């Protein structure tokens, strides 16, 4: 939960869209670039220790008892404004002399935590949008540097951002997220609208084979399927961009040579 802190917030001009998202993070842009993006903690644990990634929105939103990210978390948190990301950064990363606020383009890998979890969202004031499977480097528009609690200068553009891939995309509709909510076994939400309509079969309370572990496993399978579809979408857009660029080249330089 966010603690209220008193901040001296300086108004600065920045070229971001009202639809963009923001994440405070201790990792530097070079670290993010080497990693290929803002990856979830669970992915690193899976690589280093073979720990299965838990792609469960409800458990992600709850975090651990201490308020930290779960070791096997399959989501990356963002919020809706630069100011809110700054507040979260000061609360979580205030002990750092320096951290960064990354600006993220909207896309269907982002889920509205409050919209999907409704009244069961544990920290609604955070206005979180969670990125399923993390945020690829090509989705990061740029970043702000925060030094000793103050945002310094304007946004630095990410040279690896692919506006052609993300232009016109929007976040996932809540209807796509209800089945990924990941509520625990016998949780009342599974008997309520809208979740009861979208509940995976293994999560329906009146199912004779209903078990918490089976429900969680089903949620992970569905989440991975959604992530796979998002990656396919980017690949299709990348291919379309390539062919459009090739057509432009042919239009200027004449017909393409046949091999």
From Swiss-Prot:
Q: Cite the active-site annotation.
A: 128
Q: What SUPFAM superfamilies does UniProt report for this protein, alphabetically?
A: ADP-ribosylation (SSF56399)
Q: List residues binding NAD(+).
A: 23-37
Any one GO molecular-function label of the UniProt entry: toxin activity
Q: Which cysteines are joined by disulfide bonds?
A: 203-215
Q: Gene3D superfamilies, alphabetically?
A: Heat-Labile Enterotoxin, subunit A
In the record, which residues are listed under signal peptide? Answer: 1-18
Q: Which residues form a coiled coil?
A: none
An example Gene Ontology cellular component term from the record? extracellular space
What keywords tag this UniProt record? Disulfide bond, Enterotoxin, Signal, Toxin, Virulence
Family statement drawn from the similarity comment of this UniProt entry:
Belongs to the enterotoxin A family.
This chain's function reads:
The biological activity of the toxin is produced by the A chain, which activates intracellular adenyl cyclase.
Instruction: Share what the entry says about its subunit structure, partners included.
Output: Heterohexamer of one A chain and of five B chains.
Give the protein's recorded name. Heat-labile enterotoxin IIA, A chain
Q: Which organism is it from?
A: Escherichia coli
Q: What is the lineage of its organism?
A: Bacteria, Pseudomonadati, Pseudomonadota, Gammaproteobacteria, Enterobacterales
């Amino acid at each position: 939960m966010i603690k209220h802190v008193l901040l001296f917030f300086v108004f600065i001009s920045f070229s971001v869209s009202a639809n963009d998202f923001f994440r405070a993070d201790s990792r530097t842009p070079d670290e993010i670039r080497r990693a290929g993006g803002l990856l979830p903690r669970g992915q690193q644990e899976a690589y280093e220790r073979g720990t299965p990634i838990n792609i469960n929105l409800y458990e992600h939103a709850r975090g651990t008892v201490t308020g930290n990210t779960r070791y096997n978390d399959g989501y990356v948190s963002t919020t809706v404004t630069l100011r809110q990301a700054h507040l979260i950064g000061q609360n979580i990363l205030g002990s750092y002399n320096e951290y960064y606020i990354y600006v993220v383009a909207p896309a269907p890998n982002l889920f509205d935590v409050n919209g999907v979890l409704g009244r069961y969202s544990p920290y609604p004031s955070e206005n979180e949008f969670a990125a399923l499977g993390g945020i690829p480097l090509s989705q990061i528009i740029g970043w702000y540097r925060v030094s000793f609690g103050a945002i310094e200068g304007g946004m630095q553009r990410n040279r690896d951002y692919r506006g052609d891939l993300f232009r016109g995309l929007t976040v996932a509709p809540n209807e796509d997220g209800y089945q990924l909510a990941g509520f625990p076994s016998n949780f009342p939400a599974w008997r309520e609208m809208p979740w009861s309509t979208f509940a995976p079969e293994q999560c329906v309370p009146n199912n004779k084979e209903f078990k918490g572990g089976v429900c969680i496993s089903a949620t992970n399978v569905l989440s991975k399927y959604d992530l796979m579809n998002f990656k396919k979408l980017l690949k299709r857009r990348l291919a379309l961009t390539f062919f459009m660029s090739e057509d432009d080249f042919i239009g200027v330089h004449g017909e393409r040579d046949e091999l």
